[in-house]
Amino acid sequence: LRRYRPSVPTVWNCGGYESERQIAALDGLIDVYMPDFKYSDPAAAAAYSNAPDYPEVAKAAIAAMKKQVGTTVVENGKIKKGLLVRHLVLPGAVRNTFGVLDALAEIADGTDILSLMSQYVPYGRAAEYPEINRRLRPLEYKAAVAHAVRLGFANVYVQESSSADEAYIPEFARS
């Protein structure tokens, strides 16, 4: 990528669990960072992703991403440079979402984009965790959106509840 610069923005889509060293290695190569910011709660991060340090690692990684790309630039409805952070609101975990949004508000500026997703469908091993073995309630999602607005996020992608449909889950074949 250092030799070849494509005519379209280079996008780094990631889970947010990258080290600052990994992000530093990408400096000057990435136009748009698109990380997840899954957890502010270390207990949830430990239970669902076996990564109790996820909140601190993700916050540091996203801050490093923001420092590299600076102000988010959108032209003709297309992101050219910047930061688009995704967060999936989990059922029964609105406090986790509030914590993610609070942490993100310390990093982001008014140009950055937040994708607040409502598409959670209990699948796979969700039955092992009764607290997330259900769909998101409309009031939980509304509370999350309201908190984002209260914090001053101006560019928020929101979803209809119909996006939480098993039809959107790919068939994962085990080999």
Where are these regions (language model features)?
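Auxiliary Fe-S-binding modules of radical SAM enzymes
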Residues: G70-S175
